[in-house]
């Protein structure tokens, strides 16, 4: 089973940022340190990142992108439809992956059980082995530091990379602005 990964999404005023580390781990071995686990969807209008099984995540990305196309890029309608499809399909219910999807208006976590969760604060979401470290750091920095969104995500992921053995500090970021 692939452990690893920290993905952090942040939605601010007119900006969305997603970041992820680059470490891929199998058991107690680091297989790769510069993997890309984030991407843009729907012609660059949606940011997405995954944690969990890579093969499962690519299946989820493909399925979600088809739904986005069908819903003309409406993120809210797409995550609801995605959840419905996930729960109907027995194969999908066994996938071992989670995703964060966001734009400048919405941010969601899509769980491995087909749940759609909008963060309580509507701003910050984290998944993966270092997710709680990144989430804690991001909340503290958001509340007490005057950082731009991109720097906040990067610094939070660096903190997670220093604490979580399945996360490194080879960070990649994607940004979306209104």
From Swiss-Prot:
GO MF terms held by the record: metal ion binding; threonine-type endopeptidase activity
Chief location: cytoplasm
Catalysed reactions, semicolon-separated: ATP-dependent cleavage of peptide bonds with broad specificity
GO CC, any one term: proteasome core complex
Binding site for Na(+): 161, 164, 167
Quaternary structure and interacting proteins, as annotated: A double ring-shaped homohexamer of HslV is capped on each side by a ring-shaped HslU homohexamer. The assembly of the HslU/HslV complex is dependent on binding of ATP.
Family: Belongs to the peptidase T1B family. HslV subfamily.
Record-given protein name: ATP-dependent protease subunit HslV
């Amino acid at each position: 089973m692939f452990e690893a990964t920290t993905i952090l999404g942040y939605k601010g005023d007119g900006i969305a940022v997603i970041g992820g580390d680059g470490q891929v781990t199998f058991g107690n071995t680091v297989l790769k340190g510069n993997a890309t686990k984030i991407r843009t969807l729907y012609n660059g209008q949606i940011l997405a990142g995954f944690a969990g099984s890579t093969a499962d995540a690519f299946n989820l990305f493909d399925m979600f992108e088809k739904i986005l196309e069908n819903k003309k890029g409406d993120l809210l309608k797409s995550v609801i439809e995605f959840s419905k499809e996930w729960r109907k399909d027995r194969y999908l219910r066994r996938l071992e992956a989670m995703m964060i999807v966001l734009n400048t208006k919405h941010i969601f976590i899509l769980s491995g059980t087909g749940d759609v969760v909008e963060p309580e604060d509507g701003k910050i979401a984290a998944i993966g082995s270092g997710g709680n470290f990144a989430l804690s750091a991001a909340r503290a920095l958001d509340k007490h530091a005057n950082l731009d969104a991109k720097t906040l995500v990067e610094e939070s992921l660096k903190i997670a990379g220093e604490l979580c053995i399945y996360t490194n500090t080879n960070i990649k970021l994607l940004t979306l602005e209104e």
